[in-house]
Amino acid sequence: MSPRFPLATSSWDQAEYDALNRVIESGVFSMGTEVQCFEQAFAALVGSRFAVMVNSGSSANLLMTAALFFTSNPALKLSRGDEIIVPAVSWATTYTPLTQYGLRLKFVDTDLETLNYDLGALESAISEKTRALMVVNLLGNPNDFDTLRALTEPRGIVMLEDNCESLGATFAGKQTGTFGTVGSFSSFFSHHISTMEGGIVVTDDEEIHHIMLSLRAHGWTRNLPKFNRLTGEKRDDPFEESFRFVLPGYNLRPLEMAGAVGREQLKKLPQLIAGRRANGALYQSRLANHPRFMIQREIGESSWFGFSLLLRPDKGESRADFIRELTVAGFECRPVVAGNFARSEVMRYIDHEIHGTLANADFIDSHGLFVGNHHDPITPAIEALAAL
């Protein structure tokens, strides 16, 4: 039986099905004009110069990491062995592309209120070895980018932004995902927009954009403009140029259907975010002082991917009992992203160090969970939480 209050619901209507039929009737299924139009619309919406669509948010993280290894700009270029600071609480594929490219991960603790970086711990973790910072805006909540910029810019630290859970969030009027040199987004079913599967990388750097266009499709030059920052001027012989490989690339291309659906979803995005924020306002007003659990403190304007609940430490409650209580009440729930990822079994394969104790991340891992937010009103769900 389906839960009364699921983690995610569809935001599709007839417009998305019509878009799918439009692609089917065209007979063009692999990446083409629909994807290009989606990329242009997405870049304009978030205020970035360039957007590259891929087949998942995980692929978006892979692509943006890889691009920084091939840039000719020494201020942005990463190399194997470089140290990158990462938050202890995030999703698996925030981290795996970094280790696959040979970076050394330094895990830093999370703030119990915002669920983003503990800024004091972050500042103390930065050293002369620190080359890059991975910023994750968790569950729709922006980081304090004023502080992050003050910590990174004077030191020449490259900022990457995993914004897969936070499309539509803003800090000081600027869209999250656009603060870093590169930023990733996801359009998986449960996210703010859904293209079935999908992801996007944005950047203002033209060379990185061209590198990503090549890496996305086999490392070839076929999708590059004639005059580009990667190869200079392309040759006029399409027979040769269509099969010219210049980078060790992948196949991360999205389907044309994903681009077509994405175009329709972007038209709805303002109302989708507005609906989530209305629910978020009620969540804060009804649950901010709940005696049993703590909720996430908003920074800037969150786009409220989901609603976190952290059992208060002085109550001594069991999360397992709380989950059973939520399940009986009709809630589908899950861990806060992947919990403290530094405690995962996969860490034996990852070159890393841990800064400090990660005490907050451990607490989130053992006492935290989240329930779903949606674009439609969910007053009964929030009132049911308030009554617990």
Locations of the language-model features?
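N-terminal "arm"/small-domain region of PLP-dependent enzymes with the aminotransferase-like
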Residues: 1-28, 33, 244-246, 372
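Phosphate-binding glycine-rich loop
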Residues: 28, 32-83, 97-101, 107-109, ...
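PLP-dependent aminotransferase-like
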Residues: 70-163, 170
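Short beta-strand-to-turn element immediately C-terminal to the catalytic PLP-Schiff-base lysine
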Residues: 185-186, 199-205, 234
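Structural detector of well-ordered beta-strand residues that form the stable sheet scaffold
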Residues: 85, 106, 159-160, 184, ...
